[in-house]
Amino acid sequence: MPSNDVRILLQAAVPAAAVGAVAAVVSAVVAGGKGAVGAVVATVLAMLFMGIGLYVLQRTAKSLPHLFQAMGLMLYAAQILLLFVFLAAFKNTTLFNPRSFAVSLLVVTLAWIAAQTRAHMKAKVLYVEPEPTGEKPEKTGHSS
């Protein structure tokens, strides 16, 4: 990943992880150990989905810019589908508190989106690629 992409990833992941830690503490106080486990699972899941999504979108923007918007929509649909699969797999689980899981997932996702939006607004992204500084020598010979 180029350094700008890593910078945006870190500026989104660190606040989301901090919000996830706070959610885990609050869930532990409110719902006990299972609440804390639910908040940690939700934090890891949200950060994993959002991080992979950011990585895929950054690669798409560089290699296939004409597919960027379609890839964003497809990625959003895939994230929602994967979340539904996860929820269906752990529908009747007793491993964690589902309410603290749901609230933590929502809060961490919103924190990631807000932090990523802020990071993109502060980033100096070039909209037009600059011309290379070195002049290419002209071909003077016969081309065959």
UniProtKB/Swiss-Prot annotation:
Keyword Ligase: no
UniProt KW keywords: Cell membrane, CF(0), Hydrogen ion transport, Ion transport, Membrane, Transmembrane, Transmembrane helix, Transport
GO biological process: proton transmembrane transport
Entry GO CC: plasma membrane; proton-transporting ATP synthase complex
Transmembrane annotation, as ranges: 12-32, 37-57, 70-90, 95-115
Protein origin, superkingdom: Bacteria
Compartment annotation: Cell membrane
Main subcellular location: membrane
Record's bilayer topology term: Multi-pass membrane protein
Keyword Disulfide bond recorded: no
Functional summary from the UniProt entry: A possible function for this protein is to guide the assembly of the membrane sector of the ATPase enzyme complex.
Protein family: Belongs to the bacterial AtpI family.
Name the record gives this protein: ATP synthase protein I
Organism field: Streptomyces coelicolor (strain ATCC BAA-471 / A3(2) / M145)
Gene name, Swiss-Prot/TrEMBL: atpI
